[in-house]
């Protein structure tokens, strides 16, 4: 099953996350199918590729709870 999940990047104490489509059995830092956004919690900043996210959701990708909250704040129907 494909999931929309956060993949951590950045320095210590300054995390940056990429929102990726990845197989649910792969580890968090594993190889992703597609990168569809960036989330920086320190500044509460998000950058999303909305058409790609909608396409993945239509094809059955399931967002994790955190990604679901990010999408709801961006007013993307989940």
Curated annotation (Swiss-Prot):
PROSITE patterns: RIBOSOMAL_S16. This is Small ribosomal subunit protein bS16c. It comes from the Eukaryota. GO terms for biological process: mitochondrial translation. Belongs to the bacterial ribosomal protein bS16 family. One of its GO terms (cellular component) is small ribosomal subunit. GO terms for molecular function: structural constituent of ribosome.
């Amino acid at each position: 099953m494909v999931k929309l999940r956060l993949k951590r990047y950045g320095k210590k104490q300054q995390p940056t996350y990429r929102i990726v489509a990845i197989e649910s059995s792969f580890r968090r830092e594993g190889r992703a199918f597609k990168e569809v956004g960036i989330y920086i919690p320190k500044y509460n900043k998000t950058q999303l590729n909305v058409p790609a996210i909608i396409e993945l959701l239509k094809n059955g990708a399931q967002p994790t709870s955190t990604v679901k909250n990010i999408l709801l704040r961006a007013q993307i129907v989940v």
